[in-house]
Amino acid sequence: MTVEHNHLTNYQLPPSILQYLPIAGSKVVDATQHGQSHYGRTTRLTIQLPSGSFANYFLKTLEGELGMVTCRGEYESLKSIYSVCAHTPAPVGWGRYTEDNIDYSFLLVEFMAIQKQPAYAKNLAACLAELHLKSQSPTGKFGFHVPTCHTRNVQAVDFWTDSWCELFSSHLSRIISHAKAGFAWPEFDNLGKLILSKVVPALLLPLQTDGRSIKPCLVHGDCWDGNTATGEDGRPLFFDVASFYAHNEYDLGNWRASRHALSDSAYTDAYKALVPVSEPESSKT
């Protein structure tokens, strides 16, 4: 199907995407490049329904096997979050198609116009706390049912375990391996081994020993300035999610980086006012 467009010349909507249009007889009347992606194409689609009214969707298209893992993982992440709280665009579907002998994958979601980025501190904290407190792991364990991706890195979280230390160690080990592939630096190798063998167990094992426990919470997975915003209706929004069931404080990790607006103490203070710090608090800085 050739899109009747104003902006993207000769844009073709693959037949595999057509099945997700809301009502039979709907047609795409406009396709506009929207936002920025370092790895694929992002498009706003305007759909005309048989009634004559219009609806907007956001389409992300990526190449190759990594593109498939990314689109599927983000769709499953959005679906999981949306079932708990409607602070994400509604997930519509994902799939695959081939064009000019290139394999593509796509993610189709509700289009939501955004305003301020990041969202206001109290609003974002309330939104994130709602997700963490209301979500329930389907197995009662940490992990996720499919791989999810942080940028172009496939996260090693697609298994289930009772131990947060085990899951985080798997996750961090994969990240360290990705980093090692980019440069040769023996000191980095040694530091990575020490962090995994000494630091991670020292910080995380006490969360689940001596009678203490933590709940596996559904997390955003990449909660930084660029992946949260205020919508047109004033509500905070999440997007570009890379979810799994984790310790809730995982989502606050990005907030420690001074380059992020979320490093402002107002964000952490607002969250801690709603969700207390996990014990033993004395082991944290």
List the predicted regions and their residue ranges:
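ATP-binding pocket architecture of kinase catalytic cores
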Residues: Q33-E166, S170, H178
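Membrane-helix interface segments
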Residues: H87, Q117-Y120, S263-D264, E281-T285
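Juxta-kinase regulatory segment immediately upstream of eukaryotic protein kinase catalytic domains
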Residues: M1-A31
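Short, surface-exposed alpha-helical segments at coil->helix boundaries
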Residues: N10-P14, Y75, S265-T268
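Active-site Asp-x-Gly
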Residues: W164-S169, S173, S177, S213-L218, ...
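Helical subdomain adjoining the active site within ATP-dependent kinase catalytic cores
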Residues: W185, D189, V277-K284
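Short acidic/polar mixed-charge low-complexity motifs
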Residues: G25, S51-A55, R235
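An alpha-helical support segment within catalytic cores of ATP-dependent transferases
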Residues: Q12-P22, Y97-D100, Q136-H220, G231-D233
